C-alpha cells in the first residue's frame, strides 16, 4: 500500500511538472506568435496609400509615433525594438507614400531609401517669413510671388481655412495690426506635390494642414498652459528668430516670459527688422524708433502676431521655458549665448563679447 502511494505521488508530481512545461511552452509560444504578429502588416492585402511626413531630425521613437498615428504599424515599441535588432539607420526626412499592407522590413527599407518621387517640391525653411515662402512657392510653380502673397492675404480664402482648420486658424489672425494674417502659420518642411497643376490653394492648405497636425499634438499642453495657438506661434517665432545654432531656446523663452511678467518690453531686434520690412546685418539705434506695433522696443507685450514660422524646437521652448531669473541675453561671435540677470551684468557682457563696431 505504501509503495502504491509512492507511485501515485510520483506520477502526480510528474503530471504537475509536465503540465507546467506545457503551460510554459504555451506562454512562450503565445508570446512569440504575438511578437511576430506585431511585425506583420496592419492589413495584409491592403493597397490603401497613406501619406507620411517625416520631419528633419526625427528620432526613431518620433518616427514610430508618426507611423502608429497613421495606422501603418501595430506597435511603436515593436518598431523601435525591430529597428534596433536589425541595426537599421539612416532614416531620411520627407514625404512618403506607404500602405497598410507593408511589413516592418518594407517600411524600414522605404524610409532609409529616401522620399517618394514628386512633380515638384517646395521647401519651407525654419525661420522663413511669409514673403520668403511666397518666393519659394513662386520659384517652383506657375504662380508669381505677388499672386501668392495676394492669396495668402485674401480674407475669403482665410475664412475657408478657418472652417477647415478651426483649431488652428482663428479670428486672432484678423487683428488689424497684423501685417500678414498667415505669417507663422506655414510650417517649415519640404512639401512634394505629385500633380504639376496643383492649385495655389491646395499648396497653401498642405502647409496649414501640417501646422494643424502639430497643433492637435500639442493641444492638451496649450490648454494646460492657457496659451492660444496664435500666442504660441508668436512666441515661437520670436525664439526662432533670436536663436543661434548653439542657443538654448528654452533659456531664451524664459527671458521673454520673465520680461512679460515684469511688463518690460521684450526688446528683441528681429521684431524691429520685421517692422522695417527689410533685413539688415545689424540694427542701429535709429531703427529702434520705428513706429510699429511690431517694435518691441517701443511696445510691451508680444507682437500682434508671428514674425516668421518656427520649427518644433522653438514650439517646445515656447511651451516649456526654463525656470530662470534671466532678463537679458546676447550672442557671442561664435554663436554661443550669454544670459544675465541684470542690466549691469548685460552691459558688462556686451563690453566683453561684442566689439564697438558691432554694437547698435
Swiss-Prot record:
A GO MF label: lytic endotransglycosylase activity
Top-level taxon of origin: Bacteria
TM ranges: 16-36
Protein keywords: Cell membrane, Cell wall biogenesis/degradation, Lyase, Membrane, Transmembrane, Transmembrane helix
Site (Important for catalytic activity): 242
Gene3D superfamilies attached to this UniProt entry: Classic Zinc Finger, Endolytic murein transglycosylase
EC number: 4.2.2.29
GO CC aspect terms: plasma membrane
Keyword Membrane: yes
Entry-linked Pfam families: YceG (PF02618)
Major location (coarse): membrane
GO biological process: one example: peptidoglycan biosynthetic process
Record flagged with keyword Cell wall biogenesis/degradation: yes
Location(s), subcellular: Cell membrane
Membrane-related topology note: Single-pass membrane protein
Catalytic activity entry: a peptidoglycan chain = a peptidoglycan chain with N-acetyl-1,6-anhydromuramyl-[peptide] at the reducing end + a peptidoglycan chain with N-acetylglucosamine at the non-reducing end
Family of the protein in this entry: Belongs to the transglycosylase MltG family.
Reported function: Functions as a peptidoglycan terminase that cleaves nascent peptidoglycan strands endolytically to terminate their elongation.
The name this protein goes by in its record: Endolytic murein transglycosylase
Organism the protein comes from: Bacillus subtilis (strain 168)
Amino acid at each position: 500500500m505504501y509503495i502504491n502511494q509512492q507511485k501515485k505521488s510520483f506520477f502526480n508530481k510528474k503530471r504537475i511538472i509536465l503540465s507546467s512545461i506545457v503551460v510554459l511552452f504555451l506562454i512562450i509560444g503565445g508570446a512569440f506568435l504575438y511578437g511576430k504578429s506585431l511585425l506583420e502588416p496592419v492589413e495584409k492585402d491592403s493597397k490603401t496609400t497613406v501619406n507620411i511626413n517625416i520631419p528633419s531630425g526625427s528620432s526613431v521613437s518620433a518616427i514610430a509615433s508618426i507611423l502608429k498615428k497613421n495606422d501603418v504599424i501595430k506597435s511603436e515599441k515593436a518598431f523601435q525594438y525591430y529597428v534596433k535588432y536589425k541595426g537599421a539607420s539612416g532614416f531620411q526626412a520627407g514625404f512618403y507614400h506607404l500602405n497598410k499592407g507593408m511589413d516592418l522590413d518594407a517600411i524600414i527599407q522605404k524610409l532609409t531609401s529616401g522620399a517618394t518621387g514628386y512633380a515638384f517640391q517646395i521647401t519651407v525653411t525654419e525661420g522663413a517669413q511669409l514673403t520668403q515662402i511666397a518666393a519659394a512657392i513662386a520659384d517652383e510653380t506657375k504662380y508669381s510671388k505677388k499672386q501668392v502673397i495676394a492669396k495668402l492675404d485674401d480674407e475669403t480664402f482665410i475664412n475657408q481655412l478657418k472652417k477647415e482648420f478651426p483649431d488652428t486658424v482663428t479670428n486672432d489672425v484678423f487683428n488689424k495690426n497684423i501685417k500678414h494674417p498667415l505669417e507663422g502659420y506655414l510650417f517649415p518642411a519640404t512639401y512634394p506635390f505629385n500633380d504639376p497643376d496643383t492649385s495655389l490653394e491646395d499648396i497653401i492648405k498642405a502647409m496649414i494642414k501640417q501646422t494643424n497636425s502639430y497643433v492637435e499634438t500639442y493641444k492638451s499642453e496649450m490648454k494646460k498652459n492657457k496659451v492660444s495657438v496664435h500666442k504660441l506661434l508668436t512666441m515661437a517665432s520670436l525664439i526662432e528668430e533670436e536663436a543661434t545654432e548653439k542657443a538654448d531656446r528654452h533659456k531664451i523663452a524664459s527671458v521673454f516670459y520673465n520680461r512679460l511678467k515684469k511688463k518690460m518690453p521684450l526688446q528683441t531686434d528681429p521684431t524691429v527688422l520685421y517692422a522695417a520690412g527689410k533685413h539688415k546685418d545689424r540694427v542701429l539705434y535709429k531703427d529702434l524708433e520705428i513706429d510699429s506695433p511690431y517694435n518691441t522696443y517701443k511696445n510691451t507685450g508680444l507682437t500682434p502676431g508671428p514674425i516668421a514660422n518656427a520649427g518644433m524646437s522653438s514650439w517646445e521652448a515656447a511651451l516649456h521655458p526654463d525656470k530662470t531669473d534671466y532678463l537679458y541675453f546676447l550672442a557671442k561671435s561664435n554663436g554661443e549665448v550669454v544670459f544675465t540677470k541684470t542690466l549691469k551684468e548685460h552691459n558688462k557682457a556686451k563690453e566683453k563679447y561684442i566689439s564697438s563696431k558691432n554694437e547698435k
